[in-house]
Amino acid sequence: MATEQWFEGSLPLDPGETPPPDALEPGTPPCGDPSRSTPPGRPGNPSEPDPEDAEGRLAEARASTSSPKPLVPRPGPAPPRLSLDTLFSPITQQLRYLLKKADDFQSYLLYSRDQVQKEQLAKAMPTFLQMCEPYFLYLEAAARSIPPIYGPLQELVRKGLLEISQQLTLRLEQLVLMYASFGFVDLEEMNPLSISCFFCGRFSISLSHEVSIFRYCAPTAYTASRFPRYLYKKMRWHLEATPEAPGRGQDSLVDYYFLCYRDTWEDTGQSPANSCPQIQKLWSIGRWVPLGPAEDDLYSWILCPQPLGDYQQLLTIGFEEPTPTLATDLLVQILTGQAGQARPPSAAGPAGWAAQGS
């Protein structure tokens, strides 16, 4: 029948139309392109990938595995950086504790009627000053020692620590002077039981040199014999040099430096009675120059009430008293400026010591 013949053949396809899979003959490409025909002797399988595509993918896989890129670890979270307030919190707490103790000493002195208690507190004053020494040690060493220990924050930390050190220094000086004004404390330097000065810290300026700081509670004559005349000291520094080869019977060598002032009417030749009512004080930093007795004469040292020495002025500051922090800063500049220069014959230590710390 005609109808049966019409259904026996396949329907004509429109241009670009793909026949269904079951209507394709073996070896016939889907798009009818003769260039993409199946090679002879190999049955066509529409589910297999094209050889050219497979080779391209294989080449890409080889390229990706032949030169693998190194794995770069992602930067982890930065460690938390302490703020200055957090860093200074335990330091300021200790400062408040020591200032509170100083206020207690002052309150008992001013408001207590118990004379025995006041005398006992005066005897406890040296112990209280010694209790402050470890705190001073930390403040000055952390602020000034070389190399710095706080990295980029060193300058900010240095300023804060030195302000705290100066605040406590002036408070202790005021407290000792107040007890001395009531007659409970002696400021005479010749008295071994007096509190003429107290320790304010220590720091290193090189690998073999350390500086210790002392503050006089009141201006004190430079020597007991009052020579040089009209010269009074307010601060003292010990420059201790450790020998390069310790353990061979060599002791540390110590130089002494002072913050002093000199009454200016001495230069005019006038006596204090004929001078102006307001006497100006010319401040300077100098070094102790020993005059005697000889270092190897032990008998002379025993009979000598006080060593003789002169004052070698190294820096003239002016008529305004420097703060304790500024005075120590100026001394450090003087000491570090001596690098590579010959020291005076009476000075201890090798020349050019500051270069050792560089």
Swiss-Prot record:
Residues 1-84 are annotated as: Disordered. Residues 17-32, 70-80 have a biased composition (Pro residues). It comes from the Eukaryota. It holds the Pfam family DUF3314. Belongs to the UPF0575 family. This is UPF0575 protein C19orf67. It comes from Homo sapiens (Human). The gene is C19orf67.
